[in-house]
């Protein structure tokens, strides 16, 4: 189970020393034994990540077909977060913007774009979640036989209109459904 710790308030300009104390037994010890790895210490990957003042906390992509599976609605659900209490004071009430560009991976051709400006209203350190959608005409559909992929390039702009973060995510246009007792992908029986 991944764990994340915000050390923003403990970091100073210049050189810092990061010390980690590991306890062999804790209230979560029974969880640690689930993989039968009963050693103490850090034995999995550890990363130290620096995030911009406003950044993507979570994103979810949905693709919805029209009735004949020719055109699709691309929907991006976003949860943005503010990186620190200091950034919270700076950004509260300011305007920010996201831009989502969709590219066909095999050709690099842009197939859609969504731009949305929003007021930064905070619920603790999370910006109110929102979604954007784009209609994409006749995308190449994803299936196991033809794994056509597209690329989402998401740009988050801060209140100063500078790029705060760029995230890329590959995805496919497909529709899975259980219809008349049959499993179907893109309207075709599996």
Task: Place the predicted regions along the sequence by residue.
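Beta-strand-rich binding/interaction modules
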Residues: 70-120, 130-132
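Accessory beta-strand-rich segments of carbohydrate-active enzymes
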Residues: 1-58
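Short proline/glycine- and polar residue-rich coil/turn motifs
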Residues: 8-12, 118-128
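Short glycine/proline/serine/threonine-rich loop/turn segments at secondary-structure transition edges
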Residues: 11-15, 87-93, 135-149
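Short strand-edge motifs at loop-to-beta-strand transitions and within beta-strands
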Residues: 3-5, 126-134
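Extracellular recognition modules
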Residues: 19-21, 151-155
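Short acidic/polar inter-strand loop motif in beta-rich domains
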Residues: 23-30, 107, 157-166
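N-terminal carbohydrate-binding accessory modules
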Residues: 60, 153-190
């Amino acid at each position: 189970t991944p764990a994340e710790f915000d050390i923003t308030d403990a970091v100073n300009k210049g050189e810092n020393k990061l010390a980690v104390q590991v306890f062999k037994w804790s209230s979560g010890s029974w969880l640690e034994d689930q993989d039968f790895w009963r050693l103490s210490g850090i034995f999995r990957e550890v990363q130290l990540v620096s995030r911009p003042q406003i950044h993507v906390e979570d994103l979810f992509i949905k693709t919805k077909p029209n009735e004949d599976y020719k055109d699709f609605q691309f929907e991006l659900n976003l949860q943005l977060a503010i990186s620190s209490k200091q950034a919270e004071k700076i950004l509260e009430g300011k305007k920010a913007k996201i831009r989502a560009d969709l590219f066909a991976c095999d050709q690099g051709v842009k197939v859609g774009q969504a731009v949305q400006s929003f007021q930064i209203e905070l619920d603790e350190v999370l910006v109110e979640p929102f979604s954007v959608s784009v209609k994409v005409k006749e995308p190449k559909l994803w299936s196991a036989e033809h794994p056509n992929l597209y690329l989402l390039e998401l740009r988050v702009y801060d209140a100063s209109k500078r790029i705060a973060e760029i995230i890329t995510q590959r995805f496919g246009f497909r529709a899975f459904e259980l219809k008349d007792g049959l499993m179907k992908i893109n309207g075709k029986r599996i």
